[in-house]
């Protein structure tokens, strides 16, 4: 038996001049996992709303701050999640970032912080991140390493 699921989203982006540089902000909405059951199980649909602001201090240094909210459905998964994070890109090459996820321990999503760093050496990008979570959180002792090509 087949199944179909769709995700829908939209975003709005606006640039503006601040401190002789072009700052920008973005706001977006997403509805995900909308569709029929998969192997007899309903997918946990998600409604999301988020925004970010990008503040350049110079051509080589910028700060990005983001905030998002997600509401999960159906009833057995129903709860609100939120996240906030910041990333500072310095000298065009180095990146440091941090964030915090607000979840629901009873639903298995938990609260945890994240720290990360990265390097951009065009066309290569490398990132490392680590989750700061309690022992009973699913993100406990989680780290990620990513290497990519920018084009």
Can you describe what each PLM-predicted range is?
Residues 26-28, 39-151:
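Outer membrane beta-barrel transmembrane domains
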